[in-house]
Amino acid sequence: MSKIYPTDLTDNQWQYIEKTLLLEKRKRKHDLKEIFNGIFYLVKTGCQWRMLPKEYPKWELVYYYFRKWSFYEEFDLLLSSLRGIIRLKRGQNKEPSMGILDSQSTKWGNNKAPNNIDGNKKVKGIKRHVVVDKNGFLIAVMITVANIQIGRAHV
């Protein structure tokens, strides 16, 4: 399949992913590159799984691999590797020595969902805690109920 959408991987990008994740090279009905393209399309556009364009493999297959790779932290490995390469090119250590922590309260959920009230913001919902390095590259993310303060988040 040729490149159809702007989110589709180039051959060089795909070779890097294959090498980094040590993906098995065996005959498959659907190319893993097309499955990755489907995941990237979904992440970029925010569409629902069932609305994945027909140019990609069936949504169930793309979802299966997304869950599998998420469980085995393959995306974390890939992002960590890319972050290290860019940091080295900028003359920095491969791994960050410190991070910047911030949080944001968000309205979310219904009466049955685990949420609480952030006393400072007067928001009932959840709180996103994010750690980035000095370049703004993501290091860690954690979601808690809104009343957890940044010092207790243990991100």
Regions found by a protein language model. Give the residues of each.
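Short alpha-helical elements
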Residues: 1-154
